[in-house]
Amino acid sequence: MDEPSNMSTTSSKIPQYDFYSDVDNLHPDQFRIQCLPGRNFISPLVEQKKDFVKAHVIHDKDLDIMYDPMPKGKCNISQSCLTLPLACPRVSLHFDPSKTTVAMVTCGGVCPGLNDVIRGITLAAVCSYHVKKVIGFKYGYWGLSKAGRHTAIELTSNIVRGLRHLGGTFLGTSRGGQNISDMVDTLVEYGVNILFTIGGDGTQKGAVAISEEVNRRGLDIAVFGIPKTIDNDLSFSQRTFGYETAVSEAVIAIRAAHAEAISHEYGVGIVKLMGRNSGFIAASATVASALSHICLIPEKNVSKKVLLSLIEARFMMAKDIVIVVAEGFGQDWPDCNEDLGSDASGNKRLTDIGLVIKKIVQDHLSKNPKYHQSTVKYIDPSYMIRACPASTSDAAFCSNLSTLAVHEAMAGRTACLITLWYSNFVLVPIKTAVSHRKIVSTGGALWRQVREVTVDGSGDIAMVHQQELSRELKAINAHRNSIMEQLSKL
């Protein structure tokens, strides 16, 4: 049997790291947040919510949390000296709310929660800070270009209140970059003081470029990122918005594949899920559903030979199997070596690994008369998952994320984004956040859970099958004895 390696090869040049592992060469300076000079205005929240000030919910203190509280080596406690600044409402502001224009843009693929973030930013800016104006630029960074700047719309509380129940993005989106100088010209033309960039790593790299051009011109504009990655692969982030919704919707697809599989003799259900470089959705949905028997992710290379042996192992114990595969898995297989080019964001187009696996399984089963009634069903729910509204949990998460982003941006924080880290909302410089990619640790807790609910081909398959039959026989005997005992009392 071929032994799978611990890590797959990806096309990305971005360094990758396991969630709870150290990132090499981290330095405290990499977590230092830029702030526009001067805080000369008192927040209206001080007057509105005096009890919050007394309770120190609103303050000007710079509070940090430990970057890594996990113990390492022989020590029983963490030795990490790195910290991340906590996000909170501030007493002193850099921007005068009455003269502040807030703008936002959504970029890249759609994701559950985008409209909740648009809504949260608008309501916090309008209702809490009473800013001069909130502007939405349409269709991603194109809306900031010369060609698209005329499509900008003003956002009000009445316009955004109903967005909670809608999928997609109210502002529209697009991929690909635009001329940085033109985009900054648009910000100047509209008198924008704060720009929120809602998108993935490509979007946030664009935000860094905008911030640098703003600095070069000496403009008083804050550029603040709100990370969007349904794959949950953002570094220095425990969870990204849309991820929990995606896992919940993925479980529905897995249940459908399971229903198909158990309805046929030697039925096979295949579900392809999002996960270009990181398999968090596939792994979490596998654990949550407890109906998947094989989980394939980019972080864990598995050969075709090993895959087929795992299928045979399952078929020795049952007559159905569900395979969950992340879209980035198997791209180094010979079947996936066709060059499909890149999309507008520069991402390599992937071969549909779900279709590849379907054909491999069909060919394998067709060679064995035992499987003459087998069937293989393939489900790709990706776009349905991306386009649905956020779950209740994700919607609340988006509200917290966007509200705190407004608080910190009003205080002059710039070139940073907001993330959740060990149940706390923290600020991370954009450059640091996009310098690494988070991946599933195949030696960590999540992958351990996956291994516990899926087929394990590492042992003696015949012995495992015998033990399973023995357990079932004991259960049947116990049930029979119970019935006999009840009959004897009649």
From Swiss-Prot:
A motif (Peroxisomal targeting signal) lies at residues 488-490. Pathway: Carbohydrate degradation; glycolysis; D-glyceraldehyde 3-phosphate and glycerone phosphate from D-glucose: step 3/4. It holds the Pfam family PFK. Its cofactor is Mg(2+). The active site is at residue 231. GO terms for cellular component: glycosome. Mg(2+) binds at residue 201. Its main location: other. Its EC number is 2.7.1.11. It is an enzyme of class 2 (transferase). InterPro entries: ATP_PFK (IPR022953), PFKA (IPR050929), Phosphofructokinase_dom (IPR000023), PKF_sf (IPR035966), PyroP-dep_PFK_TP0108 (IPR012004). SUPFAM superfamilies: Phosphofructokinase (SSF53784). ATP binds at residues 109, 175-176, 200-203. Keywords: Allosteric enzyme, ATP-binding, Glycolysis, Glycosome, Kinase, Magnesium, Metal-binding, Nucleotide-binding, Peroxisome, Transferase. The keyword Ribosomal protein does not apply. The record marks 202 as: Important for substrate specificity. It is found in: Glycosome. Substrate binds at residues 229-231, 274-276, 327, 383-386. Allosterically activated by AMP. The keyword ATP-binding applies. GO terms for biological process: fructose 6-phosphate metabolic process. Belongs to the phosphofructokinase type A (PFKA) family. PPi-dependent PFK group II subfamily. Atypical ATP-dependent clade 'X' sub-subfamily. HAMAP family: Phosphofructokinase_II_X. Homotetramer. Catalyzes the phosphorylation of D-fructose 6-phosphate to fructose 1,6-bisphosphate by ATP, the first committing step of glycolysis. This is ATP-dependent 6-phosphofructokinase. The gene is pfk.
